[in-house]
């Protein structure tokens, strides 16, 4: 706690120093004519109170409007995140159309269109390491861009589910601007944050931005507490008329005490469904799951000739995870609480992620029609070292009474825990081409391809080196403008996923091939203030491992060999409506339905709701803003027969009330799970995790 307070104090001092630098020039600026000279800082979407954006590039690296992107896409702008009271990655996932969630503990498993979301991006560069326990704070990001389906062209390896791109905040203001927020909410939740931007020299060619945040919170769950500290700083510089450089660093320290490892027992020993208070968890006061993330990044944009630009981006992330956990197994005797065994566990994990992307953007014209191509190369290195403990107090011990326990014997000290060190790394290289070609005035071809190299290495003798080269990932899309407001599109996109199964000769199987077919109609109204999208899709997986029907073993082992077979097929429909209907009324609506089956025709991943829907609308009346929304999930289940666990369809309602005290100050109340619906946020093998009860958050925000 002392360290976090020191960090926050230093961060606030930095922000104040930035403020002082800008204030020192304020008097002089007022007397001068506001002329940017050769430096031009354009207004961005961050300055608009909008739920939509003019363009995005997550799908292809091309800056395409939402209408010109031949895939189902959506955007969480800063305004939308603020209105919904969303501050973290996990909270945002609950509101993304088509995403289904299954919480295990601090880990949140997410899927879309029937497939696990196994990566995300930051400024277009992929990250795979431990993302599902990091719960990234969104105060460092301007917006979140979502592309549904396969996105291998700009990613490399992954599942054909969804690409989520976090777009960092930039130092895009020549004037002093920013905001300070104070929050207070349920279960002793408090936070303070500041976001300050300013020029750093007289001309404004060098600009800076600092974001700081400190958060403390208890929970509805027994034992659980969390602290969250954020520092983010970025400097943007127009070095010349043709050279732009951005340098930045980010830091997040997320400490969580009293964490669970898995869910509550789902059944009593007599086979009936267990029922516990939502506050009860499988945790102790010494359990913890702490994650510290440190990042540095740089972006260079250089005009080479006329409109031809060179873009170079690099990022480095260091992620340290420290866990001490308690696991429960068994079925509870409903009368005396017996029948449960437990074990403790200590483990650490360190990851380092390097990303480099270099590309050249070449716009040109043919026959008076604009064309654009981008050629580039990318590199990703993900090095992870796992320090796995070996059960400090033995394997399983008997718990006398599950109802009565308050604390288990303390975990052995970290110095006493023997570790098994398991370093491993995944290296990816790729070259890619992407282009937008205007075939006719109203017909555009969006196409590209990527050639990938992927290699896995490990110091663990049980994990052999795997290497796949020349993996080709094509992308083809057509967009036809019916008129000023409507476009139809169709696309074929793909992605690959390496696997570790071997055939009868001892060779690794080829990577799983994920292919996504999509078609739809997109519309925009009121000058782009409202965007709608209706899409249908079909996703197929090929080369999925299946036991060799001959029953032969992999040479030198007792493992059944595998063959490549047809895998899961998913198909469905999605609808999105987002934007500002009038100056006072804004709506955001999305609904998704899919069905996924394996090669035998059986339902695949029954823990994923087949239908999900999200709606939020707000109305401004003078200085008051009223908002309300709901999130719907259809039935999902796991297991069968007597061990089947089912969560029936449910709806979670939310609301927002805001009052604009003056032009600079706003007071906002957000209430989640308004009617205090009890539901399972996660279900697993004989376990269940309750969702969060009704909660409220009050925010006082001062902007300048």
Feature roles, as predicted:
Residues 238-240, 351, 370-382, 422-541, ...:
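Structural signature of Gram-negative outer-membrane beta-barrels, strongest in the C-terminal barrel
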Residues 301-303, 309-315, 319-325, 488, ...:
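Membrane-embedded beta-barrel scaffold of Gram-negative outer-membrane proteins
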Residues 139-142, 153-231, 239-243, 294, ...:
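Outer-membrane beta-barrel translocator/receptor signature
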């Amino acid at each position: 706690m002392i360290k976090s307070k020191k960090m926050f104090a230093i961060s606030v001092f930095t922000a104040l120093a930035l403020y002082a630098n800008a204030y020192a020039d304020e008097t002089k600026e007022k007397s001068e004519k506001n002329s940017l000279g050769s430096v031009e800082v354009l207004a961005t979407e961050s300055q608009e109170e909008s739920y939509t954006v003019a363009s995005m590039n997550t799908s292809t690296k091309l800056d395409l409007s939402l209408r010109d992107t031949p895939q189902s896409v959506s955007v969480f702008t800063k305004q939308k995140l603020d209105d919904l009271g969303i501050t973290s990655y996990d909270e945002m996932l609950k509101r993304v159309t088509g995403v289904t969630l299954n919480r295990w503990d601090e880990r949140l498993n997410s899927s879309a269109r029937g497939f696990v979301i196994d990566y995300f991006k930051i400024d277009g560069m992929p990250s795979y390491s431990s993302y599902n326990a990091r719960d990234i704070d969104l105060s460092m990001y301007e917006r979140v861009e979502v592309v549904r389906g396969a996105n291998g062209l700009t990613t490399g390896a992954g599942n054909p589910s969804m690409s989520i791109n976090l777009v960092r905040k930039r130092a895009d203001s020549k004037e002093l601007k920013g905001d300070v927020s104070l929050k207070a909410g349920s279960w002793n939740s408090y936070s303070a944050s500041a976001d300050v931007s300013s020029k750093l020299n007289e001309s404004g060619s060098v600009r800076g931005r600092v974001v700081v945040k400190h958060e403390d919170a208890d929970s509805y769950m027994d034992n659980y507490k969390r602290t969250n500290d954020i520092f983010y700083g970025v400097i943007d510089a127009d070095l010349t008329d043709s050279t732009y450089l951005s340098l930045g660093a980010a830091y997040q320290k997320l400490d969580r005490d009293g964490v669970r490892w898995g869910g509550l027992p789902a059944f009593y020993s007599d086979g009936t469904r267990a029922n516990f208070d939502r506050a009860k968890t499988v945790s102790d006061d010494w359990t913890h799951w702490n994650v510290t993330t440190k990042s540095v990044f740089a972006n260079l944009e250089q005009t080479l000739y006329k409109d031809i630009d060179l873009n170079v981006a690099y990022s480095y992330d260091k992620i340290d995870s420290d866990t001490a956990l308690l696991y429960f197994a068994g079925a509870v005797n409903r009368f005396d609480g017996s029948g449960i065994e437990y074990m403790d566990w200590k483990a650490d994990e360190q990851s380092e992620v390097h990303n480099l992307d270099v590309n050249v953007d070449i716009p040109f014209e043919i026959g008076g029609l604009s064309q654009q191509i981008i050629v580039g190369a990318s590199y990703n290195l993900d090095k992870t070292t796992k320090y796995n403990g070996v059960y400090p107090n033995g394997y399983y011990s008997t718990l006398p009474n599950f109802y009565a326990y308050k604390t288990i014997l303390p975990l052995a000290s970290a110095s006493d825990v023997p570790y098994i060190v398991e370093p491993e790394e995944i290296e990816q290289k790729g070259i890619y081409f992407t282009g937008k070609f205007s075939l006719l005035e109203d017909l555009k071809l969006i196409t590209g391809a990527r050639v990938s190299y992927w290699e896995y290495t490990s110091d663990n003798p049980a994990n052999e080196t795997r290497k796949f080269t020349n993996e080709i990932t094509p992308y083809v899309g057509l967009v036809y403008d019916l008129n000023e407001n409507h476009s139809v599109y169709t696309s074929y996109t793909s992605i690959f996923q390496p696997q570790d199964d071997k055939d009868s000769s001892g060779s690794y199987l080829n990577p799983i091939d994920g292919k996504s077919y999509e078609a739809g109609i997109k519309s925009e109204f009121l000058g782009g203030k409202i965007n709608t999208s209706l899409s249908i899709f079909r996703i197929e997986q090929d080369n999925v491992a299946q036991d060799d029907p001959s029953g032969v073993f992999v040479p030198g082992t007792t493992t059944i060999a595998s063959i490549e077979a047809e895998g899961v097929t998913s198909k469905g429909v999605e609808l999105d409506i987002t934007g500002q209907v009038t100056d006072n009324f804004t709506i955001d609506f999305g609904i998704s339905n899919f069905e996924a089956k394996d090669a035998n025709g059986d339902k695949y991943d029954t823990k994923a709701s087949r239908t999900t829907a999200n709606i939020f609308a707000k109305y401004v009346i003078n200085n008051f803003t009223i908002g309300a929304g709901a999130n719907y999930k259809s039935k999902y289940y796991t297991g069968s027969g007597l061990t089947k666990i089912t969560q029936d369809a449910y709806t979670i309602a939310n609301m927002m009330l805001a009052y604009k005290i003056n032009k600079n100050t706003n007071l906002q109340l957000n209430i989640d799970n308004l009617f205090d619906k009890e539901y399972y946020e996660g279900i697993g093998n004989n376990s269940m995790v309750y969702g969060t009860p009704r909660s409220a958050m009050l925010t006082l925000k001062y902007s300048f």
